[in-house]
Amino acid sequence: LYTKDGEKYFIVDSHMHYWSAGPDNWVPGAEQYAKGWIECFHAYQSLGPKETHWPIEKFMSYTEDDLMKDVFEDGHVDVAVFQPTYLKEWYTEGFNTTERNAALGEKHPGMFIANTRFDPRDGDVGLTELRRNVERYGSKGVKLYTAEWNNGSRGYKLSDPAAYRYLEAAQNLGIKNVHVHKGPTIWPLDKDAFDVSDVDHAATDFPELNFIVEHVGLPRIEDFCFMATQEPNVYAGLSVAIGGLMHARPKFFAKVMGELLFWVGEDKMTFGSDYGIWEPKWQIEGFVDWDYPSDEFSDYPRLGTAGKKKILGLNAARLYDIKVPDECQLPAEAGTPAAQDDAQLVTGA
C-alpha cells in the first residue's frame, strides 16, 4: 500500500505489459516494422522524468526481475492487470501475449490479473482461441487493438458485424471488461483506426460490458468525453494521459483531467502506468500530489483524496472484483467506486 500524509492508497495498475521486442523475435521481412514500433514506444518514455529513462536494449527486453522491482517493490502497485498486444505480423512469438503474461502471473499468485485479447478478423479460429484463453487463465477482460495489422487489413471497428460476434462470445464466456486502445498512434499504424466513434456504437448495444477506453481517446479527448458522458458503461483509462502528459505537459494534462472530471467523473476513471513505457512509481506519487497548476483551470471540478483513491485503484478493483483492504475503503459519503452515473454534467443537472 502507498501511504502519503497518513492516507493509504490501494493501487491497481490496470494497464501494463511484459513484452519481448528484441531482434530475435522480429518476423523476417518485417524487421523495419518491428524495429520502428519498439523505437516509437521508446521515444514516448522520454516524456517521463529523465532519471527513469532506459537504454533501448533494456527497453526491448526487460526482465521478470526488472518488472517485479519496478512495479511492486519500488512502484507501490498492489495488483497489476496485464493487457496483451500480439502484433504477430511483426513479432514471431507475438509482442506481448496472453501466454507470456499469464506464465509470469502464475509464478506470483494474487499479484496479477491476466487479460486476453481477440481480433474479429481471425474468424472461427480466433473464437476458439478466445474460449481457450478464458477457460485456461480465467480472464475477465480483453484488450483490443483496432488498428492492428492482420493479413493485409490495417484495422477494424467495434461496430463491425464480425466484432459484434466476438463481443457476444466474450460476454457469454463471462468477460466483463473490454479495454480498447484509443489513443496516440504508434508507427506504422494508422491514426484513424484508433477513432473512438465505434465504441459509442458498441457500448449502446452491449450495456452489460464495461468499455474502458485506454489513453482516453487522445488526441480526440473532446470526442471521447462527449461520448463517455452519455454512455454509462464507458470508462476512461488514464494510461498515457498520466505517463505521457503529467510531467512533460502539465498544463495540457490539467486540461485533459479537467475535461474528464467534468464530463466523465472520478468514478469512471482508472489508473494505468503503461509499464514498461513508464515506471509506475513516479506516476503514482505525482498523481497523489497533483493539483491544477493555476487559476486558469478554475472552471473544472476539483479532485480530492477520495477521488484519487478511486482512480488509483478502487474503481478498477470494483470492475475486477478485487478485494480491497478495510483500511483502504472509502466512507459511504465518498460515493461508490466505478459507479456509472458520476459525470459532473449528470449530477449537476
Label the model's feature ranges:
Residues 1-14, 21-71, 79, 128-132, ...:
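Mid-to-C-terminal alpha-helical segments outside catalytic/metal-binding sites
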Residues 15, 105, 133, 142, ...:
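Conserved, mostly hydrophobic/aromatic
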Residues 15-21, 181, 215:
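Histidine-centered divalent metal-coordination motifs
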Residues 18-19, 184, 218, 277:
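Short active-site segment of divalent metal-dependent hydrolases/proteases
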Residues 22-28, 94-95, 127-129, 154-156, ...:
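Short aromatic-enriched loop/helix-cap "lid" or pocket-rim segments at secondary-structure transitions
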Residues 62-69, 96-102, 126-130, 196-199, ...:
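Alpha-helical scaffolding within the catalytic cores
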Residues 79-193:
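Active-site gating/metal-coordination segments in enzymes
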Residues 140-141, 155-271, 296-307, 330-334, ...:
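Catalytic pocket-lining loop regions of alpha/beta-barrel enzymes
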